[in-house]
Each structure stands twice: as structure tokens, then as C-alpha cells.
């Protein structure tokens, strides 16, 4: 049976200065969030045989391409900002890795973390598949030591021409709104998340700001992945983009009030945020 939601991207191992290794990656966190909203969730990824998919992705079908290693990330925080290192899996994910069932997913979320997802997925996707993209990993390159730097997103025109929705954080482009606006002009629907300030939706190039509820932040980890998964599902279900963005903003805001996997959406979050989003959309003049 085909999944309701398919995330395509490397799952990761995140290394910490105290020696801990924790699971990570947009495909990992977004799929766990999606599982709170839909029944059938799958992940297409590449990882070493030692990666414990049953433990890290319970209730999710994992189609794992064999890899000698699992992609690793290490973040080092300095007074001058964050320095990031990666040791990526050498396996690039291509459309040929899709099974017939995965090819027929209702939603395909392209979720690269280190330029490992081929942009050809958009060209080969069935026309009735909702394509959501979080291009963060297409914006990264690294040197021989693994230190991560920014790079141009050369495939942006190709990807955005087909994608039903794309989401970036303003931090992904180091605050460069000019670059974000360039991509927004090429997209059907483009969202820039702005942390506690909410997000800006570009619909056919026109901007709409959606505020986030005021909350007490405990842990922001994964909030962007939760936002993207929630948004893609809401849009695929037919919500007006403004209501869908308000819903996703609310769910992501609730997630930062809890730590680790406790940040995943609860039934109470989803019900409360659905009501809030409907009310906000009515006030904004876009009920559906």
C-alpha cells in the first residue's frame, strides 16, 4: 500500500561535545511528525546496517538503501556563531530507488540535509503527487575536513517549477531576503519561517505574514521540520494556504514548549491549532 507521506533524505547521527550520539535529519523528524497526522508514513534514506530504524522510526516504513556509513553532523557553538561539520553517506538518493508503492505516495517531501537528494525526483514524480521541498541540504557544501559552507541552489528553477510548496528558514540563507524573494518569485507557494516571529507566505509571489502564537520556548529543535510536515499535509488536504500556514505555525510553536520527542504534535495541539487557524483565516478574510 502506498504511503500518505514519504520523506526522502538521509537520516543522520548528530554528534555532541559530551560524547552523545542522537538521531537527526529532516526526514527523521518530519516523518515522526507526519505520523501524528496520517496513518501511513515512509522514509526513503541511506544508512549503515547498524542504524536502528525500528528504534528511531517506530511505526514508519523505512526503505533503506545500503550505505557503508550513516551521515553524521557535529555542531560547534562559538562566540562567533555555529560551526557545522558533516561526514555524509556517499549514497545519493535517486528516483530509481523508489518502489512502485513509494512512487504513488500522496505527499513526497524532498528533505535533503547534505545535497544527497537528486532534483530529478520532481521531474519524474507523478502529476497527482503533492511535492513539498525543504531545500536546506541543497544549500550546503563542505570542504575536505567536513566543515559546512553555503552554496548556490543551482536546481532551484527546476525544483520550484514543479513543487507544490517549498519551505526555508530565514537562517538557511543567513538572513538574505533578496535571495529568498528570488526563489519565491519562481515558486507556486513559498514559505520563509522566522522563528518566534512566525512566517511569511508567498502565494504567486505575493507576501502574507502569519504571526506565531507567543509561547515560552524550551527547545526549538525540530520545529522547522514539524512546520513543514504539518504544512504539506494541511495543503494536500485542501486547506487554504493562509489557514494551512497559520495551522503549521501554531503546531510548530507548541512544539518548542517541550523538549526532544515530546515536541511532536499531540492530538490536543492539532485540535487547538485547527481552531486557532480557522479563526485567524476568517479574520484575515480567507475562510477556506
Question: Where in this protein do the model-derived segments appear?
Answer:
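Charged helix-capping and loop-helix junction motifs
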Residues: 23-26, 147-154, 180-184, 210-213
Amino acid at each position: 500500500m502506498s504511503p500518505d507521506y514519504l520523506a526522502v533524505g538521509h537520516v543522520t547521527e548528530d554528534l555532541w561535545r559530551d560524547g552523545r550520539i542522537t538521531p537527526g535529519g529532516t526526514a527523521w523528524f518530519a516523518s515522526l511528525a507526519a505520523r501524528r497526522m496520517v496513518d501511513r508514513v515512509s522514509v526513503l534514506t541511506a544508512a549503515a546496517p547498524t542504524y536502528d530504524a525500528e528504534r528511531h522510526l517506530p511505526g514508519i516504513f523505512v526503505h533503506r538503501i545500503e550505505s557503508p556509513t550513516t551521515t553524521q553532523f557535529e555542531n560547534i557553538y562559538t562566540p562567533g556563531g555555529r560551526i557545522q561539520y558533516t561526514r555524509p553517506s556517499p549514497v545519493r538518493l535517486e528516483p530509481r530507488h523508489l518502489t512502485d508503492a513509494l512512487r504513488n505516495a500522496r505527499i513526497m517531501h524532498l528533505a535533503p540535509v547534505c545535497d544527497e537528494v537528486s532534483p530529478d525526483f520532481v521531474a519524474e514524480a507523478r502529476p497527482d503527487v503533492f511535492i513539498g521541498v525543504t531545500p536546506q541540504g541543497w544549500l550546503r557544501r563542505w570542504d575536505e575536513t567536513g566543515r559546512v559552507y553555503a552554496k548556490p541552489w543551482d536546481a532551484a528553477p527546476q525544483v520550484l517549477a514543479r513543487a507544490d510548496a517549498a519551505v526555508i528558514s530565514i537562517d538557511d540563507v543567513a538572513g538574505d531576503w533578496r535571495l529568498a524573494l528570488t526563489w519565491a518569485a519562481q515558486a507556486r507557494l513559498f514559505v520563509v519561517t522566522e522563528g518566534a516571529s512566525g512566517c511569511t507566505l508567498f502565494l504567486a509571489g505575493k507576501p502574507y505574514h502569519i504571526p506565531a502564537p507567543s509561547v515560552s520556548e524550551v527547545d526549538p529543535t525540530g520545529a522547522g521540520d514539524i512546520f513543514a510536515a504539518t504544512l504539506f499535509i494541511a495543503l494536500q488536504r485542501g486547506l487554504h494556504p493562509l489557514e494551512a500556514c497559520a495551522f503549521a505555525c501554531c503546531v510548530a510553536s507548541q512544539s518548542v514548549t517541550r523538549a526532544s520527542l515530546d515536541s511532536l504534535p499531540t492530538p490536543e495541539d492539532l485540535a487547538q491549532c485547527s481552531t486557532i487557524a480557522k479563526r485567524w483565516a476568517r479574520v484575515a478574510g480567507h475562510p477556506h
